[in-house]
């Protein structure tokens, strides 16, 4: 992790020396990235940045990581993702090859992110790709890898013999491991080729990246090819620098569901399937039970469906930097991004949807186009007068996005040869008005004026102030389309004081204090104006006419969610760099949470109104420490630990105008036996993420639940009414703290890297046990082997007990995992001509 005071933190709005930064910023360089098979940039820094939670929610090779910085900051009305900038251009983690990344900087607190306005309210991730710099011999770099994966721990389901013993009347004669039938040993490979070079005036870099990834489940394949070229030219004695970049990417994935990649329902069917069911009948057809609801052959779901999704992205970007006079830098950034997606999916006449539901050949097609334009103009003036050093920056930003989408589905095809998604119009359902066709267009824009000033005295006392004035089209029609977002931070380099000159412990010690305000715009447009939509049909003058009804009420007072954050931090370097790190404490108050309030009709046209009302608080501590315990000529050991603690509380659900009828709302779903029920409660005075369900404390002599009701009294199964008022908070799904531990050991030419991380202080809902340990669950034929375990160590669960979500299925979710172990060997390659890179590494 970078801690050098001389390194730069690159921002779209200018640059700052690391030593002058007064905000909470984490930097991870390429040498410290997570090595091995990674899907996107998020996995490169997993466990490397305190306070940054990075998760991979599933094994789908097309899926991306999910990132949350410093807890939860909204209850659903605003955007939650951090702003991602790739070489200063807004983008997504999946649009840059991990092998092409040089460094990642994370701006964590409000004083650092305020200048980025509304899109920086959840933090900013700055991705810097590999660059060609200075006079350099033409170089070619290749790196690649081949990887495989496996299911670390399968659900321990009954096999065929065990199933026959327990349920002899349901023996269908076969012996099928359904998980094995739908899974495989996948092989993935990634190849990255870079060419770079230049002279004192012109530099270039070209990069090609190809990735072929297989998922563990059959028919979950992903293929990606991308390339970029970037040319930088300097002229007029280096006063003018021109940079032009071109990026293109094409993704293709196999699809087993409409609009997506792998259908998770297939795995669910494999786990519930009777292990004595054959895959196929004696006549070669798929073994299906069309009379049983939601009981489907998972192999048929895979092989009686066909589809693919193709995505392309083309990006042009340019940058002009001009220094007309000493200390003055003028910059202009332009980019144009065009995303296209085309998808198609179809099911055959042998698919369960045709056999059971009468949807012969159900198929769908869809496409979208997204165009994003960015222009940003900045002017920065830097001046140093004696012990005083200051800089002033001002700028203007314009961002415009146009999104267009269309989709069609149809069924009622006569055969599998002339219909389907390749010829979707000939199905009968669309002609009969039973299928769907639609389109939409969503234009948005974001305009910002911003400024920043920094001051340093004797490199000892540091001050930064920033201001952004921003308008968003999502708030069009309200009185608050524009917002003002200020920030200020100060720093004190204590080691520059005279009283620290004779101490031998700290090489650098800096105290930071910052405060910043950022805003979150609504996820959806036009929430502040009255909207209409189509409703039901009415019979008027002998004709059925579709009515138009209210869809929302106007609210001219709707505005941004405002996050006000205070950060106090300490950076330190000791004993010649053998010990370094940072400690941060932050407090975030989010005011004006966007929430849907119930309102009377009349006078309102609609019974709900989107408005600002609630308040939420996040507090936390983040610690990063790097130690080099051993360092000599032949052996070096460097170890880095990260720790972050976060507490969250909903302070209020009501505002000065709109009041919530209750101090809570229920949300979330948990599926048991095909039913969906609210599983979470968000309540004033409590943390976000609480599980809400019935609390069981014991079982009776027959294996039936004994509950604790609303009054704390014990109630047996037959007398318990399952009233919502008898539910309790039975856990919380958000970790209270995270930790990471990264080790690098070098012995002569060998090096060993070990990356570990964990999350603690949270619970999970074990849906597998909830569904597969209940004998009465009629929609699931197979069971876990633990179905015969003693509940609370007393009795097996009674067959009288209906499947339900309760506290028995809430478990401790703490984990500690080894992400990566990499062993490397460095060796010298001799070239016939001099090369600045004569050391290569084998892994």
Question: Where do the language-model regions lie?
Answer:
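Active-site phosphate-binding and catalytic loops of NTP-dependent enzymes
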Residues: 53-56, 495-502, 829
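Glycine-rich, aromatic-lined ligand/substrate-binding cores of catalytic
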Residues: 733-764
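Single conserved hydrophobic/aromatic residue that forms the stacking wall/gate
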Residues: 1-6, 10, 831-842
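Residues on the lipid-exposed face of transmembrane beta-strands in outer-membrane beta-barrel proteins
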Residues: 129, 193-197, 229-233, 316-322, ...
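Short secondary-structure subsegments characteristic of cysteine-rich extracellular domains
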Residues: 222-234, 481-491, 833, 837
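Short, small/polar-rich motifs associated with maturation and membrane association
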Residues: 1-249, 257, 315-316, 434, ...
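Surface-exposed loop/interface segments of Gram-negative outer-membrane beta-barrel transport/assembly proteins
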Residues: 19, 134-175, 216-217, 226-313, ...
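Extended, hydrophobic alpha-helical segments in both membrane/secreted and soluble proteins
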Residues: 227, 449-453, 461-469, 483-492, ...
């Amino acid at each position: 992790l970078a801690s050098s005071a001389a390194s730069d933190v690159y921002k779209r709005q200018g640059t700052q020396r690391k030593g002058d930064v007064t905000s909470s910023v984490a930097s991870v360089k390429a040498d410290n990235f997570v090595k091995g098979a990674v899907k996107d940039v998020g996995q490169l820094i997993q466990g490397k940045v305190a306070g940054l939670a990075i998760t991979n929610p599933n094994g789908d090779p097309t899926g991306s990581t999910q990132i949350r910085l410093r807890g939860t900051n909204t209850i659903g009305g605003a955007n939650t993702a951090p702003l991602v900038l790739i070489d200063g251009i807004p983008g997504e983690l999946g649009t840059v090859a991990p092998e092409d990344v040089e460094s990642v900087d994370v701006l964590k607190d409000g004083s650092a992110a305020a200048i980025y306005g509304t899109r920086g309210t959840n933090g900013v991730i700055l991705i810097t790709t590999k660059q060609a710099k200075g006079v350099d011999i033409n170089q070619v770099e290749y790196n690649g890898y081949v990887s495989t994966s496996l299911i670390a721990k399968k659900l321990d389901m009954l096999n065929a013999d065990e199933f026959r013993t327990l349920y002899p009347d349901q023996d269908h004669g076969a012996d099928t491991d359904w998980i094995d039938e739908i899974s495989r040993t996948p092989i993935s490979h990634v190849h990255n080729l870079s060419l770079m070079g230049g002279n004192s005036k012109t530099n270039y870099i070209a990069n090609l990246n190809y990735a072929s990834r297989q998922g563990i489940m059959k028919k979950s394949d992903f293929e990606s090819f991308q390339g970029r070229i970037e040319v930088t030219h300097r002229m007029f004695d280096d006063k003018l620098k021109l940079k032009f970049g071109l990026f293109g990417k094409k993704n293709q994935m196999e699809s087993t569901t409409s609009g997506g990649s792998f259908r998770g329902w297939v795995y669910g069917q494999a786990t519930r399937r009777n292990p004595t069911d054959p895959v196929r009948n004696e006549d070669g057809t798929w073994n299906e039970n069309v009379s049983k609801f939601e009981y489907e052959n998972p192999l048929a779901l895979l092989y009686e469906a066909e589809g693919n999704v193709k995505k392309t992205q083309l990006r042009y970007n340019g940058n002009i930097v001009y220094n007309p006079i000493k200390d003055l830098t003028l910059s202009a950034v332009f980019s144009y991004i065009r995303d296209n997606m085309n998808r198609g999916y179809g099911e055959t006449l042998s698919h369960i949807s045709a056999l059971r539901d009468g949807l012969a050949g159900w198929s769908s097609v869809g496409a979208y186009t997204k165009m994003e334009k960015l222009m940003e103009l900045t002017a920065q003036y830097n001046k140093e007068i004696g012990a005083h050093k200051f800089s002033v920056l001002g700028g203007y930003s314009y961002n415009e996005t146009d999104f267009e989408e269309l989709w069609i589905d149809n069924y009622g095809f006569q055969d599998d040869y002339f219909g389907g998604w390749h010829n979707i119009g000939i199905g009968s359902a669309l002609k009969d008005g039973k299928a769907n066709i639609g389109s939409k267009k969503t234009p948005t824009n974001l305009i910002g004026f911003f400024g920043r000033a920094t001051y340093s005295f004797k490199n000892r006392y540091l001050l930064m102030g920033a201001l952004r004035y921003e308008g968003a089209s999502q708030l069009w029609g309200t009185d608050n389309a524009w917002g003002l977002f200020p920030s200020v931070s100060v720093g004190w380099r204590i080691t520059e004081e005279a009283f620290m000159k004779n101490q031998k412990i700290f090489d650098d010690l800096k105290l930071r204090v910052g405060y910043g305000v950022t805003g979150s715009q609504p996820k959806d447009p036009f929430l502040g104006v009255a909207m209409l939509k189509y409703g039901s049909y009415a019979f008027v003058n002998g004709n059925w006419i579709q009515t138009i009804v209210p869809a929302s009420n106007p609210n001219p007072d709707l505005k941004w969610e405002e996050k006000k954050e205070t950060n106090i931090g300490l950076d330190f370097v000791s004993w010649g760099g053998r010990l370094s790190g940072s400690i941060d404490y932050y407090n975030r108050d989010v005011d004006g949470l966007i929430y849907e309030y119930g309102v009377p009709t009349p006078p309102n046209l609609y019974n709900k109104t989107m408005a600002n009302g609630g308040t939420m608080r996040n507090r936390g501590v983040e610690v990063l420490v790097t130690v080099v315990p051993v360092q000599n000529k032949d052996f070096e050991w460097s170890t880095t630990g990260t720790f972050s603690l976060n507490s969250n509380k909903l302070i209020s659900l009501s505002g000065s105008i709109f009041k919530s009828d209750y101090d809570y709302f229920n949300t979330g779903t948990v599926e048991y036996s095909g039913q969906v029920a609210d599983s979470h409660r968000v309540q004033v005075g409590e943390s976000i993420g609480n599980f809400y369900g019935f609390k069981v404390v014991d079982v009776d002599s027959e294996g039936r639940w004994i509950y604790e009701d609303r009054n704390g009294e014990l109630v047996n199964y037959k007398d318990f009414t399952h009233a919502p008022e008898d539910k309790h908070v039975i856990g919380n799904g958000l970790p209270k703290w995270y930790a990471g531990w990264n080790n690098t050991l070098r012995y002569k030419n060998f090096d060993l890297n070990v990356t570990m991380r964990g999350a603690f202080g949270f619970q999970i809902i074990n849906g597998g046990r909830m569904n597969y340990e209940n004998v009465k669950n009629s929609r699931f034929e197979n069971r876990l082997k633990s179905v015969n375990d003693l509940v609370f160590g007393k009795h097996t669960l009674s067959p009288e007990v209906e499947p339900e979500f309760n506290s028995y299925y809430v478990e401790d979710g703490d984990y500690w995992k080894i992400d990566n172990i990499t062993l490397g060997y460095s060796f010298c390659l001799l070239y016939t001509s001099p090369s600045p890179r004569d050391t290569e590494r084998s892994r």
